[in-house]
Amino acid sequence: MARYLGPKCKLSRREGTDLFLKSGVKANDEKCKMNTAPGQHGARRARLSDYGLQLREKQKVRRMYGVLEGQFKKYYVEANRRKGNTGATLLEILESRLDNVVYRMGFAATRAEARQLVVHKGIMLNGHTCNVPSAQVKAGDVVAVREKSKKQLRIQNAIELAKHRKELSWIDVNTDSLEGTMKSSPDRSELSADINEQLIIELYSK
């Protein structure tokens, strides 16, 4: 499945909620008609079956984190293999992706921008350049912006935007040196309450 390159608002409108795909300079409800689906008949949202609700939730989370279907299914298999709550573990795996951690630390305004920063070798993981967005960051790992990338205007803008976001207990960030430490595994209680991971588990469990 190819990566979607179309309008970001269209994806958020399809799911009926902000997927945080845009920078946040301006409220998404001002930029996107969030209360209507895209298309000619967007004003009328179809009533979904149980399967439809499960599928929409999976698509919403997959798009939110910018993960393709094959990779997302692998994350579910891994989460199901581990001990504990499968849904919470799935979100923990998604949150531990390097591109997401870069976004959470405020070095990028969106996850897509964070992914690009990683791919273009602008990020270091434990002192070594890492250009793999899906690399799993563990507790104690240090993520930093490479020296030659620190003066990029988009990174400076992202840092300013991040000041308006809620601080997370599981990461510690130094905005002067542009590096941060993942102190512990991501805490489900600090993640989006708009995600119903149980619907995703029910979908894949069939």
Swiss-Prot record:
Function text: One of the primary rRNA binding proteins, it binds directly to 16S rRNA where it nucleates assembly of the body of the 30S subunit. With S5 and S12 plays an important role in translational accuracy.
Alphabetical keyword list: Ribonucleoprotein, Ribosomal protein, RNA-binding, rRNA-binding
InterPro entries: Ribosomal_uS4, Ribosomal_uS4_bac-type, Ribosomal_uS4_CS, Ribosomal_uS4_N, S4_RNA-bd, S4_RNA-bd_sf
Gene: rpsD
Name of the protein in its database record: Small ribosomal subunit protein uS4
Disulfide bonding pattern of the chain: none
PANTHER family the record matches: 30S 40S RIBOSOMAL PROTEIN, SMALL RIBOSOMAL SUBUNIT PROTEIN US4M
GO cellular component: small ribosomal subunit
Family matches, as NCBIfam families: PRK05327.1 (NF003717), rpsD_bact (TIGR01017)
Taxonomy of the source species: Bacteria, Pseudomonadati, Pseudomonadota, Gammaproteobacteria, Thiotrichales
HAMAP family xrefs: Ribosomal_uS4_B (MF_01306_B)
Domain S4 RNA-binding: 96-156
The family this protein is said to belong to: Belongs to the universal ribosomal protein uS4 family.
Subunit structure: Part of the 30S ribosomal subunit. Contacts protein S5. The interaction surface between S4 and S5 is involved in control of translational fidelity.
Gene3D superfamilies from the UniProt entry: Ribosomal Protein S4 Delta 41, Chain A, domain 1, RNA-binding S4 domain
GO molecular function annotations of the record: rRNA binding; structural constituent of ribosome
Record's keyword annotation contains rRNA-binding: yes
SMART domains per record: Ribosomal_S4 (SM01390), S4 (SM00363)
GO BP annotations listed: ribosomal small subunit biogenesis; translation
